């Protein structure tokens, strides 16, 4: 068959790595004239500022944003790839313009079966029927590629990813495309949720090559797994000036067989650049609160005062940065304008998000992000990790400002998680809910036409709902202009201020919501991935325990502890390691398949936090001991005792060669999309040092944060968790222990949690637990020395560092003590 081979030889519009060597002037030129990789702090590309390495928006694998194709951005900001610092003076010597030439290449079918039949991952199982001879990630695929001297086609996606489904249907279910793949490649499919270690490395590689990453990720690898080209979504046919997948496949096969030296040189350059940058060698510096304030100021510089959030579009919540701004707002001089600005950024963003279509106005819970600056039209998938972190934001907002709207949103998030995303019997939080039911819809389950609303509501309820949620004949969706994304035009309180009766408005809203939700429940429901991921479940445990304490929701606390017990029983293998997966969905029939997914730094760090939070929730020493055990295992498996900081994945066993890009060691710093592994680990160790008294925990945490201090301010919005960890390091921990039971203890506990502070922890304990062995070692040194106040039914002990104040029996006295400790 005759195919067109695309020649990319245009003027690059920026790059991700300064030392890439291209594939020659006749085609797929990446950068022939790079002048070396630099650490120039002045030219730093944030994810939403990254540009294509290989030319304009039509370049291979670099989808541009068309008015009706915002989805083609494919999550680059969500990935958060501020990974590469560039040289100012890098320029291309390639000729401008584009060229096309043709060559005859024959393809023929290759016998073989799809090897995903026994996969446990929901994403991989969804591809079992495809004619492409997919392999799961593993040694067998690489062995075959090297034995047959074939390049590897790597597809990385997720079960919740709309454009992954589109590419599956358009291309990987097409017999002609499958024939080309099976003839010329060894095909490997990876679930990014199941293997974040694999995804992170190839995202960095493709971002280096094209300036963008996202899902689906489509990468072309040497047989040993080093990437020589890649992109994101590739259409089946040529579209928007981009070649179709058949052209790309045949071009990549030709490159491997006819211009192999150039492909190998490019692959080597990409891998070297990734490993150099991901280790952050030479990024150390001084630690101070000035650095925290610089990170906060960088986030504030992007704050949108009109619509909330940061930047323009697409908009992501950036939960860690929101908490950092709240910390600044509550702990800095209230007279300074930046303190007021931080408070404004936090509160306005939470207000606008909860009013927008990015929030499910009927069932609660947040979609992944908004494609517009107003938070109206989202990408409709709902992720566990987004909702646990946003739940914490709203709980912290209620703590600090006693805002009933923040409390209501937090309760609604819990309601959605409880009803849709949990295994109520055994414990555990499910991973995600898909955006769509079918490939031809875009959020149709969540959106409404005016006629659909009229079929459910009538009279005053219809009139109210249409006005309140902006339901009209002209909707919001590009694929169906009649479809409306429900979002709040003006709040009930704003309407009441104009003279309406607030209680009547609330009654109308609640009645309309209940009827619309009941009608929506009759629609086909988007797929829920019931995989239980260790790190995400640990994040959920922490969020639930905070919520339970602040909002006094005992059932939420009990479910969190049930989940944590399951995590420790099923993900901890008894040999000192955590698995990345607690359990796969029952329909996978995977049995012990979770053992095949190795735990990452995130899994360990979030689990340490969850265990500490569980101890504070009830004083069960088993959770404290688990925190110590998991923390010690985390240090043993991931800590770089020579250069400092933590790797995201454990080193290969002695004598084993890591597969593909897993040979590149990474030290995660940026929040993308969850809080980054290194600051999360450092924060966990600081909390544990305050309980255990083990100084090495603090030393490792300080060393870890110091490794990035010279570079982290450039990460701005993506460094929120680092700022919070550094704040925790530099401020003495404040521990509030409420001793007793009944109403008096409840009042003291409510006072203790009344304001968010990153360095404050609160626990309530029975008097008989204040004995040697009943509390952690460091607390024994302080709490057991304090005399019980005579005749008091309950009292509070406030300890800062290693010093405790005398027992406090009244709420007013406790509040004053906390103000002094803050």
Question: Each PLM stretch: what is its role?
Answer:
Residues 2-12, 65:
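Extreme N-terminal basic, low-complexity initiation segments
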Residues 99-543, 547-550, 588, 656, ...:
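Replace the tail clause
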Residues 419-422, 569, 574-605, 610-775:
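Long, polar/charge-rich, low-hydrophobicity segments
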Residues 331-340, 551-552, 617-622, 693-695:
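Short coil/turn connectors between adjacent alpha-helices in alpha-solenoid helical repeat scaffolds
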């Amino acid at each position: 068959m005759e195919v067109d081979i695309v020649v990319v030889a245009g003027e690059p519009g920026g790059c991700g790595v300064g030392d890439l060597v291209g594939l020659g002037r006749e085609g797929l030129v990446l950068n022939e004239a790079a002048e070396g990789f630099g650490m120039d702090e002045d030219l730093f590309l944030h994810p939403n500022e990254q540009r294509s390495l290989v030319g304009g928006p039509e370049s291979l694998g670099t989808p541009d944003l068309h008015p009706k194709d915002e989805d083609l951005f494919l999550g680059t900001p969500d990935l958060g790839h501020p990974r590469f610092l560039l040289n100012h003076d890098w320029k291309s010597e390639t000729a401008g313009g584009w060229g096309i030439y043709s060559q005859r290449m024959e393809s023929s079918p290759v016998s073989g079966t799809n090897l995903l039949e026994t996969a446990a991952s929901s994403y991989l199982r969804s591809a079992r029927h495809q004619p492409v001879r997919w392999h799961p990630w593993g040694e067998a695929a690489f062995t075959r590629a090297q034995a047959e001297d074939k390049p590897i086609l790597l597809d990385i996606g997720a079960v919740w990813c709309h454009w992954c489904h589109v590419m599956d249907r358009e291309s990987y279910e097409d017999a002609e495309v499958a024939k080309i793949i099976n003839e010329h490649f060894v095909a490997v499919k990876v679930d990014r949720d199941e293997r974040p270690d694999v995804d992170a490395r190839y995202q960095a590689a493709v971002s280096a090559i094209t300036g963008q990453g996202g899902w689906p990720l489509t990468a072309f690898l040497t047989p040993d797994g080093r990437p020589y080209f890649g992109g994101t979504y590739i259409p089946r046919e040529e579209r928007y000036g981009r070649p179709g997948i058949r052209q790309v496949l045949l071009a990549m096969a030709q490159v491997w067989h006819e211009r192999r030296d150039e492909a190998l040189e490019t692959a080597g350059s990409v891998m070297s650049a990734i490993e150099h940058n991901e280790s952050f060698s030479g990024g150390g510096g001084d630690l101070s609160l000035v650095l925290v304030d610089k990170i906060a100021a960088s986030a504030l510089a992007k704050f949108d005062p009109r619509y909330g959030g940061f930047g323009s579009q697409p908009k992501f919540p950036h939960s860690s940065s929101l908490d950092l701004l709240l910390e600044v707002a509550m702990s800095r001089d209230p007279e300074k304008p930046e303190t007021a600005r931080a408070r404004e950024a936090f509160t306005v963003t939470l207000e606008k998000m909860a009013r927008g279509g990015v929030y499910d106005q009927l069932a609660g819970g947040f979609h992944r992000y908004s494609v517009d600056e107003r938070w109206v039209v989202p990408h409709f998938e709902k992720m566990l990790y987004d909702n646990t972190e946003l739940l914490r934001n709203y709980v912290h907002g209620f703590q600090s400002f006693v805002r009933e709207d923040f409390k209501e949103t937090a309760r609604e998030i819990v309601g959605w998680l409880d009803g849709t995303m949990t295994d109520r019997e055994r414990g555990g939080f499910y991973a995600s809910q898909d955006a769509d039911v079918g490939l031809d819809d875009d959020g149709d389950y969540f959106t409404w036409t005016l006629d659909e609303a009229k079929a459910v509501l009538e009279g005053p309820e219809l009139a109210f709902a249409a006005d309140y949620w902006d339901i009209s004949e002209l909707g919001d969706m590009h694929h169906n202009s009649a479809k409306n994304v429900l979002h709040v035009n003006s709040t009930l309180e704003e309407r009441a201020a104009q003279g309406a009766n607030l209680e009547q408005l609330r009654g109308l809203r609640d009645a309309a919501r209940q009827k619309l939700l009941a009608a929506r429940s009759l629609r086909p429901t988007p797929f829920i991935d019931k995989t239980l991921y260790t790190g995400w479940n640990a994040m959920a445990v922490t969020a639930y325990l905070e919520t339970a304490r602040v909002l006094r929701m005992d059932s939420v606390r009990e479910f969190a502890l049930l989940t944590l017990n399951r995590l420790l029983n099923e993900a901890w293998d008894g040999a000192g390691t955590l698995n990345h997966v607690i359990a796969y969905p029952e329909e996978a029939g995977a049995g012990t398949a979770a053992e095949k997914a190795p735990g990452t730094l995130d899994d360990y760090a979030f689990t340490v936090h969850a265990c500490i939070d569980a101890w504070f929730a009830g004083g069960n020493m088993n959770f404290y001991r688990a925190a110590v055990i998991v923390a010690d295992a985390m240090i043993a498996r991931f800590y770089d005792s020579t250069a400092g900081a933590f790797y995201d994945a454990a080193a290969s066993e002695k004598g084993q060669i890591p597969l593909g890009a897993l040979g590149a060691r990474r030290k995660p710093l940026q929040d993308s999309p969850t809080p980054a592994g290194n600051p999360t680990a450092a924060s966990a160790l600081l909390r544990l040092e305050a309980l255990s008294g083990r100084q090495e925990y603090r030393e490792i945490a300080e060393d870890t944060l110091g490794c990035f201090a010279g570079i982290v301010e450039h990460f701005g919005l993506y460094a929120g968790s680092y700022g919070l960890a550094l704040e925790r390091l530099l401020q003495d921990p404040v521990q509030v222990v409420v001793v007793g039971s009944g109403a008096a203890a409840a009042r003291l506990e409510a006072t203790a949690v009344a304001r968010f502070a990153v360095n404050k922890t609160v626990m309530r304990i029975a008097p008989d637990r204040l004995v040697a062995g009943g509390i952690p070692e460091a607390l024994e040194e302080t709490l057991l020395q304090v005399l019980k106040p005579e005749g008091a039914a309950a009292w509070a002990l406030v300890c800062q560092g290693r010093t405790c104040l005398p027992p406090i029996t009244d709420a007013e006295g406790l509040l004053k003590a906390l103000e002094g400790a803050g």
